[in-house]
Amino acid sequence: MTDTILDPYFGEFGGMYVPEILIPVLKQLEKAFVEAQQDPAFQTEFLDLLKNYAGRPTALTLCRNLTKGTKTKLYLKREDLLHGGAHKTNQVLGQILLAKRMGKTRIIAETGAGQHGVATALACAMLGMPCRIYMGAKDVERQSPNVFRMRLMGAEVFPVTKGSSTLKDACCEAMRDWAANYENTHYLIGTAAGPHPFPTIVREFQKMIGEETKAQILQREGRLPDAVIACVGGGSNAIGMFTDFINETSVRLIGVEPAGKGIETGEHGAPLGHGKPGIYFGMKSPIMQTEDGQIEESYSISAGLDFPSVGPQHAYLNSIGRAEYPSITDDEALEAFKELAQHEGIIPALESSHALAYALKMARQNPMREQLLVVNLSGRGDKDIFTVDKIFSERGML
């Protein structure tokens, strides 16, 4: 490993496994990030955009009805209320300010559910940067409202037809573009994964989620929660929630992976629970892979969790036992999606529904246990209504 300013590893996970040509680019990004973090003018501009453009701080909402019949108090951290509809907007604003600071004139990004693409498109529109969004052709189909939003805001959406036509293929295509155009282009990675320094940058630009949550829950309840719960694909919303609680050892950190059609079917996206460490997307982290090391197709009903690997800090937190990573199936997530809508009047993203489903399981398995839980409601479900409507109609669920 060449010298870096910040530690590129979390235990054994992380690193900079990229073509030689990109090492200086990553180091330039790291240097710009470290300098920006110490520059009051950068911080002021970032915080101003978060407050007056994105709408921070987001609310902490108590569920009045969902946990009736149990002694659990369940709060939702409302990242779904952020401009753009998900937590993605937080770190996108930070990274675009960084790109401008480095003199880059073009932004590229990958997206699965389309939420990161939308966040990138809206920030590029506002800050006057052209952008190209790489998206698996399959995801372009299942997330059509977000594709229209991106195009409406001036982004070029590039459907990727290679491989499984999903997020992992979009990531590879974006990385190729970056290697060819790094002099004028910033690759705005959408999650806390990829080569160093991306996992650290994304965490630092998302950690206000947990900071706000801690202050809000102490004000409302006078104590810390027993657990904070977030869904995990690449892991940015979860690391944003976890970071301020890592040293609070009384608080369980629960990251929920997608079990898809059931772990036993092989159709899932749970590399922490069922993968093996390997090199992928510029980092060392658990990956879903075959016996001979080929990357397996991940699967989840939610495009944003349909990823065969995970951010290296989550791999580290899992390896030291500080965080736990259970999984939730498509069907459990769909049920939670429906329950939150029907009992609280909030339509969650299918991604966030995985975290909600696990919280409801915790409440209902121990109805007499007094628990204070916080779920990071990482995004809203507008993008998923057509997918869910089709399934509910077929199954007679509504």
From Swiss-Prot:
The modification N6-(pyridoxal phosphate)lysine is found at residue 88. Its cofactor is pyridoxal 5'-phosphate. It catalyses: (1S,2R)-1-C-(indol-3-yl)glycerol 3-phosphate + L-serine = D-glyceraldehyde 3-phosphate + L-tryptophan + H2O. Pfam families: PALP. The keyword Amino-acid biosynthesis applies. SUPFAM superfamilies: Tryptophan synthase beta subunit-like PLP-dependent enzymes. It comes from the Bacteria. Keywords: Amino-acid biosynthesis, Aromatic amino acid biosynthesis, Lyase, Pyridoxal phosphate, Tryptophan biosynthesis. GO terms for molecular function: tryptophan synthase activity. Its EC number is 4.2.1.20. One of its GO terms (cellular component) is cytoplasm. InterPro entries: Trp_synth_b_CS, Trp_synth_beta, Trp_synth_beta/beta-like, TrpB-like_PALP, TrpB-like_PALP_sf. Gene3D superfamilies: 3.40.50.1100. Pathway: Amino-acid biosynthesis; L-tryptophan biosynthesis; L-tryptophan from chorismate: step 5/5. PANTHER family: TRYPTOPHAN SYNTHASE (PTHR48077:SF3), TRYPTOPHAN SYNTHASE-RELATED (PTHR48077). The beta subunit is responsible for the synthesis of L-tryptophan from indole and L-serine. NCBIfam families: trpB. Tetramer of two alpha and two beta chains. Belongs to the TrpB family. HAMAP family: Trp_synth_beta (MF_00133). This is Tryptophan synthase beta chain. The gene is trpB.
